[in-house]
Amino acid sequence: MNLKIIYEDGNLLVVDKPAGIDIEGIKSALPEGSFPAHRLDKDTSGALLVAKNQETLDFLQKQFQERRVDKKYVCLVEGNIPDKGGTIETLVGRAKGDKRKQKVYLAGEPGSGRDAKTEYRVLERFKARLPDGQDYTLLEVSPKTGRKHQIRAHMTYLGHPVVGDKLYGFKNQKVPTGLKRQFLHAAYLKVSTPDGNTKEFISALPQDLILCLQQLKNS
């Protein structure tokens, strides 16, 4: 597997992770001695930080733990979000009865949730032209914590699941023709690097997601 390289120096590698490949698959394609500094879901594409040595890995992971990494995703969700943006703050933890999923817990609700905060901003709205059509909203999403499946669980909690999400999406969801996976892309990272600088990394939308948006605009 040939991974597209967004950035590389002596300590750090930023790759453009394709959808459909989990982190273990990515590891097998990395240079020997390199380690992903964080995770992206199998069907999520986008910028992935990779440390070339243990010292850099520790340096990067500490920033994630201290919530100092600025992360922005682009996602398409079901329905029309009328507001310009908002913040979702809940607890998120493992769902009882399904080890694959995370569940949103409210304050005082029995469970083992941990604090989770997600900010979102509307980029574009797609109104259905037919009476039985589906509205969609394109969002820029910034998770301020790093819980497993946080964006996906929070969007479903909001009532607007990520389009194409087979685990958190509503039953009988309408998916744009040709979209084969969830519309969730890690588009931006801002992080301090071991050389003392702060760097920003951008991953452009992949072709399958671009085609999906073009279809919605033209339909």
Question: What spans do the regions from the language model cover?
Answer:
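RNA pseudouridine synthases
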Residues: 1-219
